[in-house]
UniProtKB/Swiss-Prot annotation:
Protein family per UniProt: Belongs to the methyltransferase superfamily. PrmA family.
EC number(s) from the headed UniProt entry: 2.1.1.-
Enzyme category, top tier: transferase
Protein name as it appears in the record: Ribosomal protein L11 methyltransferase
Amino acid sequence: MNTWNELTVHVNREAEEAVSNLLIETGSQGVAISDSADYLGQEDRFGELYPEVEQSDMIAITAYYPDTLDIEAVKADLADRLANFEGFGLATGSVNLDSQELVEEDWADNWKKYYEPARITHDLTIVPSWTDYEAKAGEKIIKMDPGMAFGTGTHPTTKMSLFALEQVLRGGETVIDVGTGSGVLSIASSLLGAKDIYAYDLDDVAVRVAQENIDMNPGTENIHVAAGDLLKGVQQEVDVIVANILADILIHLTDDAYRLVKDEGYLIMSGIISEKWDMVRESAEKAGFFLETHMVQGEWNACVFKKTDDISGVIGG
């Protein structure tokens, strides 16, 4: 009987995405996030904390490694690499690593206990694929299988991206999703009325996972998934481009985004830690965009830029 090692990292919430990616890089076959912020009794309002709910800055990220890997060596490697995160301006807090052994049957279902249906925005609720869930009036359901942890919709950067899509999509738009990951933003765009969505990711695994998630959601045949390096080689002009990726990468796509976004169209960017916000804003404005909306949740920033000659509705206009 095969066995697995379950490793849990207790880390500051700011480091969730970076640590999740690191766990996958070191051989984990999946990760699960346990975050007190996911259990608020009310809808998330992008930064407000409700006093009746006890909150913690620390989260638990649980990863699952096959027994063919030396878990002690993995833990030592992780400890060294996590220590380096502080040097890049990413606060990890007091990191704690715990591990235990699981048999195959435990692994098959254990990680699923971390995922429950989550109301992410006013209209959008993300539901694990194995859960029976009855939509309420006006509620749009995104079915997801978070097995490879490319983003399940609960991370602040994804939440703000979804909120921004709700803000700009009115129906009939064309959308490009750069670095689609799980495909959650593309699926949301389809549910919010976009006509055609083009989803790109450099990672072949992400392309496969995105397509699998898209296939779970009826009516999403208008999403076209392909491997791609940012916007290189893309010629399709669109109404909206959305990119939830690292700030250092975002600054390399703003010129191409301006070329591809139609007049009066939008560029949505997320995944920006606060210390790099000015750098991203300057890159977008230099390309020709005007800032319309700036959102902040904790140390994460997201923004909506507009390609327009009428600056009356933009920040500072």
